[in-house]
From Swiss-Prot:
Compositionally biased spans, kind Basic and acidic residues: 170-190
SMART domains for the chain: UreE_N
Entry annotated with the keyword Chaperone: yes
Name this protein carries in UniProt: Urease accessory protein UreE
Residues of the signal peptide: none
Length: 203
C-alpha cells in the first residue's frame, strides 16, 4: 500500500496537464481534517494518508505519495445546508449565531453553507433565514477551526446548543443523540487581544 505523506504548497505551480493526470482522492470535509487516514483513490487503489498533524486538505490540493507520484484532492459531495436570507441583516445574524457555536461555514455570495444539522436548520429558520438541504462539496473558511475540531470556549456552549436542540425536539417530537463534550470550564474573554483567530467578528 502506498503512503501519501506530503502536500505541495499552494504557491508551487505545477503543469496543469500533470495535475489532471493524477488520480483523485475524493474526501468529505471531516475526512479532509484527518492527518492519519486509510483511504481509497478514485482508481480503486487503497492508500494510507500520513500528513503532519493539523493538516486540513482543501479541494484542489496536490499530494505526493512515497513513490513520488502525485495525487489530487477533490471535495466530495455531502449533506449540507444552504442558508439564504431576505436581507443582509438576517444573513449577518445567521452568520453571527453560527460563529458563536464555532460552526464551520463556507461563505458564498448571498449564501452560507454548513454541514447538515437539523438543530441548526431549525435555529436558522427561526432567525428568518431560508434553509435548504442539498448535496454539495463543502469547503469552509480556512484557518478558523483548528483542523476541523469544534468546541465551545466557555461553559455556556453546551447549554446553548442543548437548549437549541431541546427546542427542536419539542417542535418536531423526537430527539437526537448528538452531544458536545469539549466545552471548557474557564472563563474566556474575547476581545482585541484574543489570539485564537476566529472568524465572524464575534467573541
Amino acid at each position: 500500500m502506498r503512503t501519501i505523506d506530503k502536500r505541495i504548497a499552494p504557491n508551487v505551480r505545477l503543469a496543469a496537464t500533470l495535475v489532471a493526470r493524477a488520480p483523485a482522492l475524493t474526501l468529505a470535509y471531516d475526512a479532509r481534517c484527518k492527518s492519519r487516514l486509510a483511504a481509497t483513490l478514485d482508481t480503486g487503489e487503497d492508500v494510507a494518508l500520513v500528513l503532519p498533524r493539523g493538516t486540513v486538505l482543501r479541494d484542489g490540493d496536490v499530494l505526493v505519495a512515497d513513490d513520488g507520484a502525485l495525487v489530487r484532492v477533490a471535495a466530495a459531495h455531502e449533506a449540507v445546508l444552504l442558508v439564504r436570507a431576505p436581507d443582509a441583516l438576517t444573513l449577518t445574524r445567521a452568520a453571527y449565531h453560527l460563529g458563536n457555536r464555532h460552526t464551520p461555514v463556507e461563505v458564498g455570495a448571498g449564501c452560507l453553507k454548513l454541514e447538515y444539522d437539523p438543530v441548526l436548520a431549525d435555529m436558522l429558520t427561526r432567525l428568518g433565514a431560508t434553509v435548504e438541504r442539498a448535496s454539495a462539496p463543502f469547503q469552509p473558511e480556512a484557518g478558523a477551526y483548528g483542523g476541523g475540531h469544534r468546541h465551545g470556549h466557555d461553559a455556556t456552549f453546551a447549554e446553548d446548543y442543548a437548549l437549541a436542540q431541546q427546542v427542536f425536539d419539542e417542535h418536531h417530537g423526537h430527539s437526537h443523540s448528538r452531544s458536545h463534550d469539549h466545552d471548557h470550564d474557564h472563563d474566556h474573554q474575547h476581545g482585541p487581544s484574543c489570539s485564537h483567530g476566529h472568524h465572524h467578528g464575534h467573541r
